[in-house]
């Protein structure tokens, strides 16, 4: 119970941090730093690496992360953890909050004359123009933190192989960090968008882990 309370407190602290970041972004306080980081990544650009980073972007795309989340739910159901499968709501809620902030917070992404072509995704149809064209927070980062974090959490507890349990969190962390770099390298997001996605995703991940580790009636979990 102590560990669960600590996780709940951490989720609350991250939620407060996310709200504070959102207010700072709305006030334009991150604009100078966003532009400095963008300029730094423009200097790193190598056209020959473009296809590679487009492929990396797919790891955080709606299509791949949704399939992975469905796979996690199916796995939990097959293992007779039916109630645990409701952790999918953490993913759904995070997606809903991402869309809410993009629809209500005016924060255009880097100019399209600068940004490089992102990995193909159905989200491009609704994010290229209209009310969802704002870029805060990064949807790729939100999805990556929630999905890869939850998969790592489940693997660490249920995988029959000790190597898989040991590698679960490092691999998930590597994928998340790689996607954060990818968002900035392709110049499709400001650094504040990436931070926002990390924070919002972390809140949803912690909420999901609390559900998975909840005390069960008549026993300890």
Where are these regions (language model features)?
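Interfacial segments of alpha-helical transmembrane regions
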Residues: 5-13, 69-97
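N-terminal transmembrane-helix/juxtamembrane module of multi-pass inner/ER membrane proteins
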Residues: 1-68, 104-128
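Divalent metal-coordination and catalytic microenvironments
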Residues: 37, 56, 101, 140, ...
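Hydrophobic alpha-helical transmembrane segments
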Residues: 57-79, 143-151, 155
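Membrane-embedded catalytic cores of phosphoryl/pyrophosphoryl-handling enzymes
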Residues: 118-221
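Aromatic-anchored segments of alpha-helical transmembrane domains
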Residues: 17-20, 92-100, 174-184
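Membrane-water interface at transmembrane helix exits
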Residues: 22-26, 38, 98-106, 152, ...
């Amino acid at each position: 119970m102590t560990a669960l309370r600590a996780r709940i407190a951490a989720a609350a602290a991250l939620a407060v941090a996310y709200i504070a970041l959102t207010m700072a972004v709305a006030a334009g306080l991150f604009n100078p730093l966003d532009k400095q980081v963008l300029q730094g990544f423009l200097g790193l650009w190598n056209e020959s690496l473009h296809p590679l980073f487009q492929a990396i972007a797919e790891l955080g795309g709606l299509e791949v992360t949704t399939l992975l989340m469905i796979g996690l739910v199916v796995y939990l159901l097959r293992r007779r953890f039916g109630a645990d499968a409701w952790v999918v709501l953490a993913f759904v809620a995070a997606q809903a909050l991402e869309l809410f902030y993009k629809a209500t917070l005016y924060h255009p992404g880097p100019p399209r004359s600068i940004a490089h072509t992102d990995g193909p995704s159905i989200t491009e149809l609704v994010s290229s123009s209209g009310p969802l064209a704002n870029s805060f927070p990064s949807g790729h980062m939100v999805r990556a933190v929630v999905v890869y974090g939850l998969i790592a959490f489940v693997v660490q507890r249920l995988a029959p192989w000790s190597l898989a349990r040991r590698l679960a969190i490092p691999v998930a962390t590597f994928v998340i960090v790689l996607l954060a770099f990818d968002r900035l390298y392709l110049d499709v997001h400001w650094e504040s968008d990436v931070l926002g996605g990390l924070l919002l995703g972390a809140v949803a991940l912690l909420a999901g882990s609390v559900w998975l580790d909840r005390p069960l009636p008549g026993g300890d979990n």
